[in-house]
UniProtKB/Swiss-Prot annotation:
It is an enzyme of class 3 (hydrolase). Gene3D superfamilies: Urate Oxidase (3.10.270.10). Pathway: Cofactor biosynthesis; 5,6,7,8-tetrahydromethanopterin biosynthesis. The keyword Metal-binding applies. This is GTP cyclohydrolase MptA. The gene is mptA. It comes from Methanoregula boonei (strain DSM 21154 / JCM 14090 / 6A8). Transmembrane segments: none annotated. NCBIfam families: GTP cyclohydrolase MptA (TIGR00294). Pfam families: GCHY-1. Homodimer. One of its GO terms (biological process) is tetrahydromethanopterin biosynthetic process.
């Protein structure tokens, strides 16, 4: 005789998360990490941008509750991702803001929510001479924090990217130039000819693969162009790098890098200068985080430089006021 299927339980299920914990201590962040999602963001008059993204989603938790309702986090992420596909959200940092706001609605006990998104973005590029098409992976970071108030939530958001490029060391290049100058003088070459030669053919130096990071934090109503951030990162190193290079391309890339030697410090300062000119419409309290890591070729260590400041602080320093502390 076949066994009758069990009927689903129709009674009220216990809400264990809502019970009181044994230790009544507030928790700063409770949530889920590494939630992998496919993100599609529509753009006006352009193809949609598709990201493979990892989300970290948190809420704060009062000491009176044993646990947070984590399933609500997944529901909110999926709802906002659908809004992005439908065109209601058209920037990835706004996507994080939308998730953070909805989390406050769903977690009525929370006063603070936080959403982080780490993505990889494929950028199509052309090599400088042969114009061969290749692709580059750019790491994209977005974050939003929402805080409950008696009125509307206060939301701060940030958008950033990490780009790989090439740097040429100015120190070693000047050492090599001084040596070459001495040799050429010994061969009877006049200084004017020597200077003309160096202007066309820069001296050799050791190189680094550089990783630049730039992130801008603003209020929720401000717009920060991700493509402009990526462009600033690329232009702040000695030269770009490519997955595929023909011989002519390789010559052009190496020449460009050696004509534009930069220390790791130079890269960070150049980024800061370009941010001030490229995002001059942002308020002075916008926070900029700039990092550069150069993987040395003739040393066993990496070179590193960093700056974190408001736009107002950077502008004051560029204008000659160096009293602001880093």
């Amino acid at each position: 005789m076949d066994k009758a299927p069990e009927q689903p339980f129709s009674g009220k299920l216990p809400d264990v998360q809502a019970t009181s914990p044994d230790v009544r201590i507030n928790l700063t962040r409770v949530g889920v990490k590494n939630v992998k999602k496919l993100v599609e963001v529509t753009r006006p008059d352009k193809r949609p941008v598709v990201f493979i993204s990892n989300f970290d989603v948190y809420v704060d938790l009062p000491g009176s509750l044993k646990g947070a309702n984590l399933s609500r986090n997944f529901e909110v992420i999926d709802e906002v991702l659908q809004q992005a596909i439908d065109g209601e959200v058209n920037e990835i940092e706004n996507l994080c803001s939308a998730v953070a706001r909805k989390l406050l609605d769903r977690h009525e006990y929370a006063d603070r929510t936080e959403v982080l998104m780490r993505s990889e973005f494929m950028v199509k590029r052309e090599t400088p001479v042969s114009h061969t098409t290749c692709h580059e992976v750019v790491k994209v970071h977005a974050r939003a924090i929402a805080k409950r108030t008696f009125r509307d939530p206060i939301v701060r958001k940030s958008i950033g990217a990490e780009v790989t490029g090439m740097t040429a060391c100015p120190c070693a290049q000047n050492i090599m130039k001084e040596r070459a100058n001495h040799v050429l003088e010994g061969l009877g070459i006049d200084q004017k000819t020597i200077d003309a030669f160096f202007a066309e053919v820069p001296m050799a130096t050791h190189n680094q693969r550089g990783r630049g990071f730039l992130c801008i934090e603003t209020d929720d109503d401000q717009h920060v162009d991700l493509e402009k951030i990526i462009r600033i990162l690329k232009e702040s190193m000695s030269a770009g790098i490519y997955e595929l290079l023909k011989r002519g391309d390789e010559s052009a890339v190496v020449l460009a890098a050696h004509k534009n030697p930069r220390f790791v410090e130079d890269c960070v300062r150049e980024m800061a200068k370009k941010v001030l000119s490229g995002f001059d419409y942002l308020p002075g309290d916008a926070v900029v985080t700039i990092k550069q890591t150069n993987e040395e070729s003739i040393h066993q260590h990496d070179a590193y430089a960093e700056r974190r400041a408001t736009l107002a602080e950077l502008q004051d320093e560029l204008n000659g006021d160096h009293k602001t502390s880093c």
